[in-house]
Amino acid sequence: MRPDEEDGTTKSPGSRWTRIWAIIALILLILFLLVLGAAIYFYINYKDSSDVCLSPGCIKTASVILSSMNSSVDPCDDFYEFACGQWIKGHPIPDDAPSVSNFENLGQDLEFALKELLDENDEPYDYETSAVGKAKYFYNLCLNESEILDNWRTTFDEVVKSFGGWPSLGHQMKPDASIEMLYADMVAKFKADSLFKATVQPDDKNSQRHVLLIDQPQLNLFARDFYVAAENEERMAYLQLIRDVLILLDADRTRATLDAKEIIDFETALANITMADEHRHDIAELYTKITLGEMRRSLPHFNWPLFFNRMFKDLHEKNGKRITFDDNTEVVVYGYEFLRRLDVLIPQYDNRLIVNYLEWCWFFKTMLRDLPDPFALTIFKFYKTLNIMNVQKVRWHGCVTRINSLMPMATSAIYVKNHFDHEAKQQVEEMISLIMESFVDLLLSEDWLTKETKQTAKQKVNEMKRKIGYPDYLNDPAAVNNEYKTFKVYPGHYYQTKFSFYEQYQRDVLERITEAVDRERWVAGAALVNAFYSPNTNEIIFPAGILQPVFYSKDFPSSMNFGGIGVVIGHEITHGFDDRGRLYDNLGNIRQWWDNATISKFEHKAQCIEKQYSSYVLDQINMQINGKSTKGENIADNGGLKQAYRAYKKYEKRHSRPPRLPGVNLTHDQLFFLNYAQIWCGTMNDKEAIRKLRTSEHSPGPIRVKGPLSNSYDFAKAYNCEPGSQMNPREKCRVW
């Protein structure tokens, strides 16, 4: 017997094949595990490479985001610094401005685009019939300093003569000089608003018709505070400016010094009888409708019938009948107490002083700011003292601003033709629908609103008219030409042309007194970086100029567009339900459509916002925010952010998820809030910061980020902020 037979382990041919198959199976298993490991490694490291957008637009967007952020900062500690830290370091304040911001940069980009369009002169200007031709000709007249220096005094002397002379310049006043007639002429021809504002606008209690309106004056310094506070640098610089300008106009030096002091004393007295803006939020309380007859009897020291009839003396109804007013004519007054105090103030000053004040204001607002040297140097010294600028702005900036203000639809026509992304209109339409839908959902879920109030509020949202980009007629040159057919150009004469434009612009406004309100009319041009809610027409307006980065871009993922223009849309919708907008119904009429219990609950919620913002300090100047004067805008910021985010989540469910941005390690929820914050990246010098806190109804940029985000549970969740952290306080405020 063989040894292998003796131990009982003899092997057959089948067992050998079993071993071979086992080896093969082991090899296959090893190969499978290697492939699986490689697949897992690839999945972990490269799974999203197809989900990254590498288009030039996405790369640029990612670059802008990353270059603005300070990622070393904890977003739950200081989100403004996290979002804007590097932007601020990379954007020093320019010498010709007191501040710089993303928002201001957009405005400058738009200005430059208009400049290039107005500079184009491929063919001779048709300033007889073409609106664009008139705008271009006006712009070039404005740039021609030598021609202005040759002609300005002639126009100045003619206007002053029509006023009856300027006493500060040694002109003899007529014994029967009438303040009412002088100021009426200034309002009718130059849009004057220095004694009080007088205009025509829709009646807030009957929004289908126009009405005569009186309101407080627009003072020449930045705010009422600069007059009523103790002696300050702003007022001293303003006094010096008045004196220096009077001397440049050939006034006697001694007389100029005395008159400058009297002018500023009168303006200060005028400021003291006005109401601070923070107390003017309740439009219903301010609104007083009174007849001219009642004004004549109760305010005897100003002849109101004479004033209004003089103001409209050259205006006619469509049937050719002259527009006149009698004792039965109704006037809406915003702040009747101001008029009562004005009636007491006027007799305390002689006519000579009041005429000097009115003519100074006329010159300051209509001529001084676009006269070349030596006047330009004088007003520059004033601005430099106030730290508004350290070098003079290049002249074209002011020229673009003036023509865009006087002929907004002409400049808008060329702007949208060359710079508007027409796809944006359709996309923004969808965003508005979603945001309105989200706001209605929010309204219906609020337990502090009664059922009746919810239904009326829902109706107001659903009937809110939307205007996006520009009015369609801007595509029709003939229609634009027709709008400005009465605007007359005087070749070679800048101020004569400017004043004729002023008068025609104002004529168009005043003639509406006999017409029904046209709800299709745009209240602003399209070449504008801004957005609006109009309460007496219940409409939201988004001009073409704001539909650009950082607010909107077709290269942005949807998260960023909702965090940008989406929040702006939500902000404007919320204005219809803030402390002012809530007073108007769906038709744009002031009436009480909330019951008293609901009003009380609203005011309690709004008070929380006011108290919260009043506790904030702008660290740069260690000065508290005025939570009362900024309350309406703060309510809109908070509500707009919440609505836009909810709308974005709706959008996300209905559309495919956008690809990621290259190199940006943030979720789309995080990008939503980041883009909102980066809109407000900016910096300003200390004096500008003080002016903004005293004059603006908006909180400064850092607070517009901190306030709404610290009230947002959605933000805290997106950035995993612990309760009690700086950006996720346990106590939060919200109205909507």
From Swiss-Prot:
Description of the deletion phenotype: Severe defect in olfactory plasticity in response to the odorants benzaldehyde, isoamylalcohol, diacetyl and pyrazine.
InterPro entries from the UniProt entry: MetalloPept_cat_dom_sf, Peptidase_M13, Peptidase_M13_C, Peptidase_M13_dom_2, Peptidase_M13_N
Tissue and organ expression note: Expressed in muscle cells, GLR cells, SMB motor neurons and AIM interneurons.
Domain (Peptidase M13): residue spans on this chain: 52-736
Coiled coil: 103-123
Recorded superkingdom: Eukaryota
Membrane topology: Single-pass type II membrane protein
Chief location category: membrane
Keywords attached to this entry: Coiled coil, Disulfide bond, Hydrolase, Membrane, Metal-binding, Metalloprotease, Protease, Signal-anchor, Transmembrane, Transmembrane helix, Zinc
Stated family: Belongs to the peptidase M13 family.
Free-text function comment from the UniProt entry: Required for olfactory plasticity, which is the change from positive chemotaxis to dispersal after prolonged exposure to an odorant. Thought to antagonise snet-1 by degrading excess snet-1 peptides and thus enabling olfactory plasticity.
The protein's name in its UniProt record: Neprilysin-2
The species this protein was found in: Caenorhabditis elegans
